[in-house]
Amino acid sequence: MARRYDSRTTIFSPEGRLYQVEYAMEAISHAGTCLGILSSEGIVVAAERKNVHKLLDDSVMTEKVYRLSDNISCTVAGITADANILINHLRWWAASYRNSYGEEMPVEQLVQNLCNEKQRYTQIGGKRPFGVSLLYIGWDKHYGYQLYQSDPSGNYTGWKATCIGSNHQAAVTLLKQEYKSPNLEEAKQLAIKVLWKTLDVKLASEKVEMAVLTRRDGKTVLEELTTKEVDALIAEHEKKEKEAETAEKK
């Protein structure tokens, strides 16, 4: 019976479900883990690099954190080709707003624009939803630092900390337990802790990309952490884990 409805993007099933949207969300659940953590001093994002191969050229590897404007960036989980189309839309809207009004586009307004476009693709026959979720990070003069998440249906929500991609439910559960209004350094350590406990592989610097969005001298700055900095965070977490194990044995 379900086959009557799951091949059509625009038809609801008798249970009130849009199967194609659900399938798009399922595709995202198999993508690399991406998480964002809001702190009092900025925002930390961390994204898993999946399918790392020793023959891949690091200089041309697909990035996981994308700059959209001077004040806004994002990370994605899902079908990369779909993400590239949406990122181009986001950059065009942000640039058009800046050219028209002489200031940066508010973060939530940019998110709303894209979600309107994503929702439109759930109502057009002959097209499919975009198989990608995004985490948006940014700063504006209205609300300061902001973290948003959107899914293929066009829904978006604001978060203090969240995760998309594989193992996202376990990661969100851990974030609920551990998030306590951290500063920037604590947010970095929390990101490493969550990835350490939820990834299916041993955490290493070549398997994760981390970036920090902060304000400096009146400007928004997005800095990607170097391999050495990520290694240091992982080593610090390993040390804490060993100390905790030793304390439990005593």
UniProtKB/Swiss-Prot annotation:
InterPro entries: Ntn_hydrolases_N (IPR029055), Proteasome_alpha (IPR050115), Proteasome_alpha-type (IPR023332), Proteasome_asu_N (IPR000426), Proteasome_sua/b (IPR001353). SUPFAM superfamilies: N-terminal nucleophile aminohydrolases (Ntn hydrolases). It is found in: Cytoplasm; Nucleus. Keywords: Cytoplasm, Nucleus, Proteasome. GO terms for cellular component: cytosol; nucleus; proteasome core complex, alpha-subunit complex. PROSITE patterns: PROTEASOME_ALPHA_1 (PS00388), PROTEASOME_ALPHA_2 (PS51475). The keyword Cytoplasm applies. One of its GO terms (biological process) is proteasome-mediated ubiquitin-dependent protein catabolic process. Coiled coil: none annotated. The 26S proteasome consists of a 20S proteasome core and two 19S regulatory subunits. The 20S proteasome core is composed of 28 subunits that are arranged in four stacked rings, resulting in a barrel-shaped structure. The two end rings are each formed by seven alpha subunits, and the two central rings are each formed by seven beta subunits. The catalytic chamber with the active sites is on the inside of the barrel. The proteasome is a multicatalytic proteinase complex which is characterized by its ability to cleave peptides with Arg, Phe, Tyr, Leu, and Glu adjacent to the leaving group at neutral or slightly basic pH. The proteasome has an ATP-dependent proteolytic activity. NCBIfam families: PRK03996.1 (NF003075). Belongs to the peptidase T1A family. This is Proteasome subunit alpha type-4. It comes from Caenorhabditis elegans.
